[in-house]
Regions:
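Extended, charge-enriched "interface" segments that sit outside catalytic cores
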Residues: 1-31, 295-304
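A short, well-structured juxtamembrane/interface segment
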Residues: 17-34, 199-211
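Glycine-rich phosphate-binding loops that contact phosphosugars or nucleotide phosphates
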Residues: 27-195
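Flexible loop/turn segments at secondary-structure boundaries
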Residues: 48-51, 76-78, 101-103, 136-139, ...
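Short helix-loop-beta junction
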Residues: 57-66, 115, 239-250, 323-327
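Active-site phosphate/pyrophosphate-binding segments
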Residues: 119-278, 367-384
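Helicase-primase coupling helices
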Residues: 254-339
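Generic C-terminus detector
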Residues: 343-384
Length: 384
């Protein structure tokens, strides 16, 4: 990587922030939390929660503490509903922020600290965790009040932190096999670092994206027929929007939750403005089965008798690719299985491909100067 970006490339080597010692520490800490908590509140916004949420909401283990999300809204209605969920539950909270000036996590952390102190008294500090950078005001709070402090890597931007304390602790609390996740990332790292350009899937994806961009396609839709990817889309959208969207350049990332949204945006994709190209995530291994049993009542769906919903879903997927590819470019990324290992592979693949895509486009993949514009006016209005 370029020397000027070196302070943002701590994610390139997965081992740097997810070696055996770090994983062991996180597993032991998560085990302690799981033994004492009904719910774990993840306070964070954007890169501080998207990676963890994408895996937790897809793979959370039955019986694991509920993961409740805070610090991602300023809506009093949403915040009150979140606080209502805490009633009667044994709680731990983790405030995750690289920049503790961000309003959403900062304000949520205050009301949740106050709740913890009211609920647990002098024992509250044992249940409060903060994940921040060394020397930050968040670390100062931990030192002063006895909260547990975890390091947010200074050399990793928020949207690249899946394989660090930021993403791994909440996942481990939810019962995710973080070793399998990290191994998936390591295996993908080895693959995309060692393969030649003509065989390198990350390089091919980055090049194709830029080729379509140059041909006038300004929107990329990441689509799948698996609802478990719902929050992974949010992570992916932030990754590409913040990394590429600058200097009046960039491909606008959106998601297609199929088959449901074939009945809404499907019309635009098929017949609307030709501005979209599509990338499909296709899970190749069947994890579950549900057979449509015959029914003596005539409902005109007898053609489904004996068919597995896996087969039906795949038929819808293949038909969609066939139809859409007649109008727009369609790529497919095959995902071996919906499990922690393959989520790890996806994280590293997209991070590395995004980095390459930004290099081709000629923008810095690791800054986000545009997000400061609204903050100036907001802080002025609030009297900061």
């Amino acid at each position: 990587g370029e020397k000027c970006y070196a302070d943002s490339q701590g994610w390139l080597d997965t081992e740097e922030w997810a070696d055996d010692a770090k994983l062991k520490h996180l597993e032991e800490f998560a085990k302690e939390i799981r033994a004492n908590a009904d719910a774990f509140v993840l306070i964070g916004v954007g890169g501080s929660n998207n990676a963890a949420r994408s895996v937790v909401e897809a793979l959370r283990e039955d019986g694991a503490p509920e993961i409740i999300y805070a610090g991602n809204t300023l809506s009093p209605d949403a915040l009150n509903r979140m606080m209502k969920k805490l009633e009667g539950k044994s709680i731990y909270i983790d405030c995750i922020a690289k920049n503790f000036e961000t309003l959403e996590p900062g304000s949520s952390f205050r009301i949740l600290r106050q709740y913890m102190e009211k609920t647990y008294g002098e024992e509250a500090h044992k249940r409060i965790i903060a994940t921040g950078t060394i020397g930050s005001s968040l670390e100062e709070l931990c030192t002063k009040y006895g909260y547990t402090f975890l390091e947010f890597p200074l050399n990793v931007g928020g949207r690249y932190t899946a394989m660090t304390n930021v993403g791994l602790l909440p996942m481990a609390v939810a019962g995710i096999d973080i070793r399998a996740l990290v191994q998936g990332a390591k295996d993908m790292q080895k693959r995309v670092h060692e393969e030649s350009a003509e065989n390198n899937i990350a390089y091919q994806y980055a090049c194709l994206r830029n080729l379509y961009y140059q041909e006038g396609y300004r929107v990329e839709m990441l689509s799948s027929f698996e609802p478990q990817f719902r929050f992974f889309y949010k992570w992916w959208i932030q990754l590409f929007a913040e990394s590429e969207g600058k200097e009046n350049k960039g491909i606008f990332p959106v998601a297609g939750e199929f088959s449901e949204e074939l009945h809404s945006v499907g019309q635009f994709i098929q017949d609307g403005s030709p501005i979209i190209f599509e990338t499909f995530l296709d899970v190749t291994k069947q994890n579950s089965s549900l057979i449509v049993a015959p029914d003596e009542k005539e409902d005109y769906f007898n053609y489904l008798d004996g068919k597995d919903f896996w087969e039906i879903n795949k038929a819808a997927y293949h038909a969609t690719v066939t139809a859409h590819s007649k109008k727009l470019p369609c790529l497919t990324i095959e995902v071996g299985e919906l499990d922690a290992y393959h989520f790890g592979q996806l994280f590293y693949f997209f991070q590395f491909a995004c980095y390459l895509s930004c290099k081709i486009m000629g923008v810095n993949a690791f800054d986000q100067p545009g997000v400061e514009a609204y903050k100036k006016w907001m802080f002025e209005a609030l009297g900061k």
